Amino acid sequence: MKLKYIILTIGLIVLAHLIILFVCFYQPADSKTLNVPEKLESPKTAVKNDSSATVRPVQQVNPSTGVAAVQPVSESRNRQYPPFNFQTAWKGVIPDLPASAGTRAGILVDADTGNVLWDKQASTPVQIASMTKLMTLLLACEDIQTGRNGVTLQSPVKVSSAAMKIGGSQVWLDPKETFPLEELLKAVAIKSANDAAYQVAEFLGQGDVYGFVGRMNRRAREIGMKNTHFHNPHGLPGKTSAEDNISSPADMALLAEYCLNHDKLMQWAAMPKADFRGGKTELVNHNNLLPRRKYPAPGVDGLKTGFINRSGYCVTVTCIRGGKRLIAVVTGFDSGKNRDLFTRSLLNWGYARRNDPAAANLKTAQIKPRPVSRQVRKTAARKPAAKKTAARKKRK
């Protein structure tokens, strides 16, 4: 009898071990394979847990300005935007903004869709002043990207006497100096330095500035800029309006899209300030819509301002809010302040219209610039300017 109890006890122990092994190693059929959700989620929970859902950046308020600074979404800068085509773009009903009286020509583009949210004579050629430098910067970045003639960001560039003589906005280059190419490009993008732009063109053109300008015009045609012609790499005025660089707001919006595809260019354009010459010279960005500038607008991360007497105050602006990218181009204002305040209002209105067209009632665009005091003369026949070595001292 005692032996039976011993055998029974051993049997129970073995059975218990078998049960434990079964529980530990048995795996039920995968619920995903059976198309059965592991856990039912409410719609709100499902969206929250969906890794593909758009996550909007957290807005942080700048204590000094009281303006919410929207941090750019990293993926949006690296993405390739569809080439903008003004002729085929969806335009819907283009409103006549009551605040746009001060702009000679302009456009607001949704870079993600290519839709035109607003335009005013957007295909009309106008003087573009220093917005010219966007093409100079684009060609430089493309040369670096492809390694054209062995060019890199660290390529040493010796300053020429011709570059030193270029006037207007400048960093006072000296023929005794040599800079890495990147330093000169920063001076072009941030300070809008005309002498640096000339020096970059001379370097990339292997001594032939006008050969580089020819490349600028060829590249403009290649990417579809139909109303654009360059005479120089910096945007300073010619002796007559026929020698001024011209483009249209639609063309400049297209050029801005190509610039968006170059991280370094956008990094420079987004800097409110930067050091030059190892900190001996400060570069201050002319774009007052950037953070820590006079009229900061949430999400603005570029791109380029411009001014000569015949162009008025103009700007090409890139902005991203909630992962959505807009490009604004305005020209012809009689003051930088009016240009900046209108552009900021235009961006606010554009995002409201983009998100809810019915809600965009133009109330955000209340700035009414004074009428333009200087009317830009119509550009004469586009004849290439003769080669000149003398400096053009006119004000930028």
What does each model-identified segment do?
Residues 146-173, 217, 274-278:
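Short, glycine/proline-biased beta-turn/loop segments that scaffold the active-site neighborhood
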Residues 115-116, 325:
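Hydrophobic "anchor" residues
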Residues 383-396:
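Long, low-complexity, intrinsically disordered segments
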Residues 1-12:
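N-terminal Sec-pathway targeting helices
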Residues 164-198, 282-301:
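Conserved catalytic neighborhood of penicillin-recognizing serine enzymes
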Residues 114, 127-158, 252:
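Active-site SXXK
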